[in-house]
A protein has these predicted regions:
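Conserved catalytic core of the tyrosine transesterase superfamily
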Residues: 1-262
Length: 262
């Protein structure tokens, strides 16, 4: 109705709270609510700077809490199933096996994996050198299993005609160039389906699984942060949420009081 309209100067904190409640009632997603509130706050900041208003009714306005979306994680058995279904009789079989072992063993980003060089591997020391975001380098421990698979792959790699400029790249395509990110996604999708795993698995899933399994095994969060190449510990802390979910499931599954008595 006409008499319900208000000028911008007349709108109060309570009016805005009512508006947000209406957004919630009509089913607007919390993320969309947060964007709307952010827009309103920006508008009122502009009015305040322009001296059109003297009080900002949005000052105490809070955005809705948005639930943390936990990344997909594979179990150890699922990882093993994916690796075990790789057909080593195929020309690219050993490459794929070594590649996925390294991905899981070291928790690499897909760009770090495709850019990995033969000269980045230090088998005696048990480390690989990784170039992460912003060209920052870090040393990451590599498992004996992954090193063995790389050694096996190198026999096949020697039969590939390598294009100029890619001589030091570890994981090569059939054309003798570095594997593309899309190709790595495709290989993982193919192997996940072959293993009968019905999850949305990507290269990043292996990275998430690496971090989660370390945390479940009792690894220090700072050590995981270092291995993942996270600048901030808060980025790594998402895995504590996954670990809590793992613990919750373990309790529900194994604790004698977790199920109602019949």
């Amino acid at each position: 109705a006409e008499d319900e309209k208000k000028y911008v100067k007349e709108i109060s904190y309570d009016d805005l709270q009512q508006f947000i409640a209406q957004l919630r009632d009509i089913g607007i997603h919390p993320r969309s609510q947060a964007r709307i509130i952010s827009g309103i706050k920006s508008f009122y900041r502009f009015l305040l700077l322009d001296n059109y208003i003297t009080n900002d009714p949005t000052e105490l306005l809070e955005s809705p809490k948005i639930g943390l979306k936990l990344p997909e994680v594979l179990t150890v058995n699922e990882i093993n199933s994916i690796l075990d279904t790789i057909d080593l009789t195929l020309p690219e079989g050993q490459r794929n096996r070594a590649m996925l072992e390294v991905l899981y063993s070291c928790g690499l980003r897909v760009s770090e994996l495709t850019g990995l060089r033969y000269s980045d591997i230090y088998p005696k020391e048990g480390f690989i050198r990784v170039e992460g975001k912003g060209s920052k380098q870090r040393l990451v421990p590599i498992s004996e299993v992954a090193l063995r698979e790389i050694k096996n792959y190198l026999y096949d790699r020697n039969s590939v005609v390598v294009k100029k400029g890619f001589e030091d790249i570890l994981f090569l395509s059939r054309r003798g160039t570095a594997l593309s990110r899309i190709m790595v996604f495709h290989i993982i999708k193919q192997q996940t389906e072959a293993a009968g795993i019905h999850k949305n698995v990507s290269p990043h899933t292996f990275r998430h699984s690496f971090a989660t399994h370390l945390l479940e095994g009792g690894a220090n969060l700072r050590a995981i942060q270092e291995m993942l190449g996270h600048e901030k510990i808060t980025t790594t802390e998402i895995y504590t949420h996954i670990d809590r979910e793992f613990l919750r499931k373990e309790i529900l599954e194994h604790h004698p009081r977790s199920r109602p008595r019949t």
